[in-house]
Regions:
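Acidic, metal/ion-coordinating pockets
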Residues: 1-252
């Protein structure tokens, strides 16, 4: 089975990059299932009903979220109405369960979403290590894919090794820069520290460059605006064939 996981889709340029590339990538790599992180889809903060509908129409099967889960009020209705939006399991007030189990040709695949706690400025978060243990104990599945939305690479690597051999993949999201450390861990789990961002190419992790530069050089803090110009598509392809697993980076 081949799974395409698309990195944080950021703003209108991210959505454009998604719509322009997803069909070709699915065809070229014989993709069976598409998962995408959508927490930045609406101007960098959250997701709307309209964007959700567009994502479904373009071929995404499951949407994961992150620290901007509640960035748009539409999320509350979407969580009530839709089953394929997965929000971080270690939110204490998570109205769902932080995972979604789906069936593909008789195979059960469980997608788990977790938030890191290091440098994430949310003291209410539960421990992602303990929460994922609880999910794995309670939910029996043929395959498990974990989206770990976290800032610190050390926390991501630690969770990857902690879950090595127990899940099929631990995929880092949030930092918006694709890392080159994709690998198969010693006990068979596929790992990458960050899948990267699908969005503006020449902004600062999605934001208009001058806004961020002014913050660093002049101390001027302005509202973030999505960068314009060129765009990029980042993701990974997971081959979770039981005989030989692999992870391949995609950058367009």
């Amino acid at each position: 089975m081949k799974i395409l996981f698309i990195g944080d889709i950021y703003g209108d340029l991210g959505r454009e990059a998604l719509y322009e590339n997803i069909a070709k990538v699915k065809k070229d790599y014989n993709i069976n299932l598409v998962i995408a992180n959508g927490e930045n889809a609406a101007h960098g903060r959250g997701i709307t009903k309209k964007i959700y509908k567009e994502f479904m129409e373009c071929g995404i099967n499951v949407i994961t979220m992150g620290n901007h889960t509640y960035g748009n009020k539409d999320i509350f209705d979407l969580l009530e109405e839709k089953s394929n939006i997965v929000i971080p399991a270690n939110y204490p007030a998570n109205p769902k369960c932080g995972y979604q189990a789906i069936n593909y040709n008789g195979t059960k695949i469980t997608i788990i979403n977790l938030l890191g706690r290091v440098y994430m400025n949310n003291i209410a978060l539960d421990c992602p290590f303990k929460i994922v243990d609880k999910i794995l104990e309670e939910v029996k599945s043929d395959h498990y894919i974990v989206d770990f939305h976290a800032e610190a690479t050390s926390e991501k690597v630690a969770l990857g090794l902690y879950l090595d051999g127990r899940v099929d993949a631990v995929l880092g999201t949030h930092t918006h820069v694709q890392t080159a450390d994709e690998r198969v861990l010693p006990k068979g789990t596929l790992y990458i520290s960050d899948v990267g961002m699908t969005g503006p190419l020449n902004g600062v992790i999605g934001v208009e460059a001058n806004i961020v530069i002014n913050k660093f050089t002049k101390g001027i803090i302005e509202p973030n605006k999505t960068a314009t110009g060129e765009k990029q598509f980042n993701g990974v392809i997971l081959d979770i064939n039981n005989n030989k697993k692999s992870i391949t980076r995609i950058h367009i």
